[in-house]
C-alpha cells in the first residue's frame, strides 16, 4: 500500500464538480442474492451515494492520467471510476474488492474539516484524511470505511484490471 497527496484542493473541487454531474448508481452484491445489504454498504437508505462514472474519457481521463502517472498508472484502459459520498451514519464494512480487479486507488476529495469519523482503514492502517491524499493498494487487501459521525465524506475510487498498472518497486 502506498499513499501520497497528489491532488490540490482546487483539483479536488474540480473532480467533485465533474462527479456531481452523474446520477447515483445501484450498488449490488452477490451475497445471498441480495442487493444493497445495509450491513455491508448502506446506500439503500441513502446514508451514502455511489455514482458510477464509468470509464474515464476526454478531459477527465487526461487529467487523471497525468496526475496518477507518478504512482504507476500508464493508461486508463480497463479502469472504472466511482464517486462516493457518505453522510452521517454512512459506512462501508471491511471487505476486499472483486476478483476481476487488480489495484484500488482512492482519492480523498473532501476536507477533513467537513466531517468526523469516516476513517478509511486499509490493512488495519488508518489512511490520512488530508484533501487530495491518494492511496493505492492491491484489490485483494481488506479495507473499510468506518461510520461517518457528522458531515459529508467524499472520495473518488478507481479500479484497474491486471496489465493496466505499471508495477514498480517504488510507486510513491
Predicted regions and their residues:
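Non-heme Fe(II)/2-oxoglutarate
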Residues: 1-74
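Catalytic core of non-heme Fe(II) oxygenases with the double-stranded beta-helix
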Residues: 58-172
Amino acid at each position: 500500500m502506498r499513499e501520497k497527496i497528489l491532488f490540490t484542493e482546487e483539483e479536488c473541487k474540480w473532480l467533485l464538480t465533474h462527479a456531481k454531474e452523474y446520477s447515483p448508481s445501484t450498488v449490488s452484491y452477490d451475497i445471498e442474492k441480495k442487493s444493497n445489504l445495509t450491513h455491508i454498504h448502506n446506500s439503500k437508505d441513502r446514508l451514502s451515494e455511489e455514482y458510477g462514472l464509468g470509464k474515464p474519457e476526454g478531459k477527465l481521463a487526461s487529467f487523471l492520467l497525468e496526475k496518477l502517472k507518478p504512482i504507476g498508472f500508464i493508461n486508463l484502459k480497463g479502469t472504472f471510476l466511482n464517486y462516493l459520498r457518505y453522510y452521517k451514519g454512512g459506512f462501508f464494512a471491511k471487505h476486499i474488492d472483486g476478483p476481476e480487479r487488480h489495484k484500488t486507488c482512492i482519492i480523498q476529495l473532501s476536507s477533513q474539516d467537513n466531517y468526523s469519523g469516516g476513517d478509511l482503514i486499509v490493512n488495519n492502517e488508518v489512511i490520512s484524511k488530508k484533501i487530495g491524499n491518494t492511496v493505492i493498494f492491491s484489490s485483494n487487501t481488506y479495507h473499510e470505511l468506518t461510520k461517518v459521525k457528522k458531515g459529508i465524506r467524499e472520495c473518488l475510487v478507481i479500479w484497474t484490471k491486471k496489465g493496466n498498472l505499471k508495477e514498480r518497486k517504488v510507486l510513491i
